[in-house]
Regions:
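Bacterial N-terminal signal peptides that target proteins for export
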Residues: 1-10
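Bacterial N-terminal signal peptides
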Residues: 10-21
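Noncatalytic, solvent-exposed loop/strand surfaces
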Residues: 23-150, 154-531
Length: 531
């Protein structure tokens, strides 16, 4: 009897070791095998360019800001492509709108000139529209598609000069200019907010590529649909990353449904959760999480918010819990502490822990800012949650707590400076790496004490950052939106190992497997490896 128990123990340990090694040799989900941005067995090159250490580079269909996931010899991506098919009546509605606009122009009162308004619109100021294209041409000096602090200040100065010239000559025109300037950051016209509801159909696909050559293996269409709302100008309709265990690929297209594919691209089941209503039509972006046979899906929105646990085998809901949260874009993280497997989720009102097997709320801890995007990272002791929209906050929360942990000894340490808006943190070698806002300003802290190791270090050549940092073999990779990629030494001191440049705009987080670094750009997918 004892021999059988010992034999079973050794078999269990062997299978655990094999499974752990297998997962470590893949990048199965958004933030890697341990959901912390680290590739345990990775070692891609530190130096590369368009002409150096590019194993392959391929054109991508449609759009998507989701991260590639890699399993064995396959790379999987999601894409949303316009089909060219318009919604019924959309062209007629456009024609009617044009006729109405022409009629209004003809009825303009005599003596009321449109010359000033036209000039203002051409300059990107005033009127009822905000000419973002012209604004970016004039003020986005580094060409990263985003305005940094200096560029925004230059834009504000230009606004003041424009308004000063108009003031006193035509108060009503000036008032329209002020309203028009503010509306540029709203949601109705795209601008800095969300976009209009599209009138064109999209094709939502899962695509498999050969890892060594970049050749397309297969393409599976999940659905075609006209999305019910718009999205942020830098976002898109394929922003949630897939997740795989080597048996199935789980894909969330949000309001277009949750899908379970086999490894050949065949849909085994799909589930509809209705239409999500996001703040300012910013769009959807939370990725599904997979733990054994349970899928965890976050559904934080402006209407009723929920978190779901779904059976991977059949798509049936295991449990569903209401969340007192508005729109959020973080991805749930699953961890086991002292035998209890729990789901950790960031939120503007609280960080929460749910027991995986039944959805029971174990603990919560408030303090985060609004619009939470960064996902939580965990080690054996703490969960590290942060946010950086209209404020800054990071908290190291001890695992194993119970109830409301706000302001208790269960919060190991906090900080309120330099935290990210979009990029998630990197947790590596007892250090947590993160960026300030969406900018190339780096901070690093010791996870045990919260002590600042690197504070507000500006990364030369990088201004805007959406991608989350990753690390492998003692190297940290930080990808800028303008195609600049800086490689740092994974240490407590700031040391640049290499500065690289690619001819692409990057919003997606990188993936690392073995000696390969995968970078999804606006138009291309790169595989970086030593030649």
């Amino acid at each position: 009897m004892k021999k059988n128990n010992l034999k079973n123990l050794w078999i269990g340990l062997f299978l655990f070791f094999v499974n752990s090694t297998l997962i470590a040799d893949n990048w199965p989900n958004w933030r890697g095998p341990k959901a912390n941005g680290v590739a345990p067995n990775g070692n891609p090159p530190a130096e590369f360019s368009e002409n150096k250490n590019v194993q392959w580079k391929i054109n991508l269909p449609g759009s998507g800001s989701s991260t590639p996931v890699i399993w064995k010899d396959e790379v999987f991506i999601l894409a949303a492509e316009k089909t060219g098919k318009k919604a019924a009546g959309s062209e007629d509605e456009t024609s009617n709108e044009r006729r109405n606009n022409n009629s209004q122009r003809r009825q303009r009162p005599e003596g009321r000139s449109s010359e000033r308004g036209s000039s203002a619109n051409r300059n990107g100021f005033g009127g009822n529209s905000f000419n973002r294209e012209e604004m970016m041409k004039r003020f986005d000096k580094d060409g990263d598609g985003e305005l940094n602090d200096a560029e925004r200040q230059a834009m504000r100065d230009e606004f003041r000069q424009q308004f000063s010239r108009n003031r006193g000559s035509d108060r009503r025109s000036n008032e329209r200019s002020r309203r028009g300037g503010r509306s540029g950051s709203g949601s109705s016209r795209g601008g800095f907010g969300g976009g209009r509801k599209p009138t064109e159909e999209y094709r939502f696909s899962l695509i498999s590529y050969d890892r060594e050559s970049g050749k397309e293996n297969w393409r599976s269409i999940a659905t075609t649909a006209i999305p019910h709302e718009g999205h942020h100008r830098d976002h898109g309709y394929a922003s949630a990353s897939p997740v795989t265990d080597g048996k199935n690929i789980i894909v969330s297209f949000g309001s277009r449904g949750l899908y379970c594919f086999d490894m050949k691209g065949k849909i085994e089941w799909k589930k509809d959760f209705g239409d999500m209503r996001t703040r300012n039509s910013f769009g959807e972006g939370s990725s599904p999480t997979l733990h054994e046979n349970t899928i965890v899906l976050l559904w934080d929105q402006e209407d009723d918010s929920y978190i779901y646990a779904i059976d991977k085998k059949n798509g049936k809901i295991k449990w569903k819990r209401e969340r007192n949260e508005a729109t959020g874009w973080c991805t749930p993280v699953v961890t086991t502490h002292k035998g209890v497997t729990q789901v950790l989720v960031n939120g503007s009102k609280a960080v929460r822990s749910y027991r995986l097997n039944d959805g029971k709320l174990l603990w919560q801890c408030s303090g985060q800012t609004g619009n939470p995007v960064p996902s939580i990272v965990v080690d054996k002791q703490n969960a590290y949650a942060m946010s950086g929209f209209r404020g800054a906050y990071i908290a190291a929360i001890k695992l194993g707590g119970d109830g409301d942990l706000t302001g208790t000894e269960s919060v190991a340490w906090t900080a309120n400076r330099g935290t990210p808006y979009v990029p998630s943190p990197l947790l590596s070698n007892d250090r947590i790496w993160y960026l300030a806002g969406n900018n190339g300003i780096l901070s690093v802290r010791d996870t045990k004490s919260g002590k600042s190791l690197i504070e507000g270090e500006r990364l030369t050549g990088i201004s805007g950052v959406y991608a989350s940092p990753v690390s492998a073999s003692g190297k940290v990779y930080i990808v800028g939106r303008n195609g600049s990629i800086i490689v740092l030494k994974d240490s407590a001191k700031f040391e640049v190992l290499a500065s690289n440049k690619l001819d692409e705009k990057f919003d997606c987080s990188p993936a690392i497997v073995g000696n390969q670094l995968f970078l999804r750009g606006k138009e291309h997918l790169y595989c970086i490896a030593n030649n």
